[in-house]
Design a protein with these regions (language model features):
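A short, contiguous, amphipathic alpha-helix enriched in charged residues
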Residues: 55, 91-119
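DNA replication initiation on ssDNA origins
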Residues: 1-59
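Short, charged/polar, Gly/Pro-enriched secondary-structure boundary elements
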Residues: 141-147
Length: 160
């Protein structure tokens, strides 16, 4: 799925029409960090070293988060949404809903360890829609870049 992730939807700061607010208390928040803080954690030191090497002011990066946000080729984060089955076989009111929930919890809890260059900052399990599913939002990055900052945002090379 391609598109913008909705952090406000994931954290239930607003409710879409397919959400049952009476079940929202069953949702699980695994991780909720400010994306700007994550960018500072990941990129500030590399940005400082990069800027120190620049002889032209127009090559300096003032705010890496804003640079990525204003890029036509990048977006500040990526999101995956995972569910097991569909509303008929693992839906909220089926026998397998709890099994699906436990599998998704295990998957979400281990995602960061399995994907060390996808920095998870926002992750939620939703039990208030038709089927249990988990949203995982992350910032993909690489280290050791030779072309720009030593630590930089990239979706394609983060999976190598």
């Amino acid at each position: 799925m391609v598109g913008k992730g909705s952090l406000n939807h994931n954290s239930r700061e607003f409710y879409a029409s397919n959400v049952d607010p009476n079940r929202s208390h069953l949702n699980i928040e695994f991780c909720r960090e400010d994306i700007r803080n994550v960018y500072h954690e990941l990129f500030d030191k590399a940005q400082e070293r990069f800027n120190a090497k620049q002889t032209r002011n127009d090559r300096r990066v003032e705010d890496y988060y804003e640079k990525i946000c204003s890029s036509k080729q990048e977006k500040p984060f990526h999101e995956i949404v995972l569910q097991i089955g569909n509303k008929d076989d693992t839906g909220i009111h089926t026998e397998l809903a709890e099994t699906a929930k436990q599998c998704l919890i295990e998957y979400a809890n281990g995602f960061q360890a399995r994907n060390p260059t996808l920095r998870v900052f926002w992750s939620h399990l939703h039990m208030d829609e038709a089927t249990p599913h988990v949203h995982i939002d992350f910032v993909p990055y690489i280290t050791g870049s030779k072309r720009s900052m030593a630590v930089s945002y990239t979706h394609l090379r983060a999976h190598e």
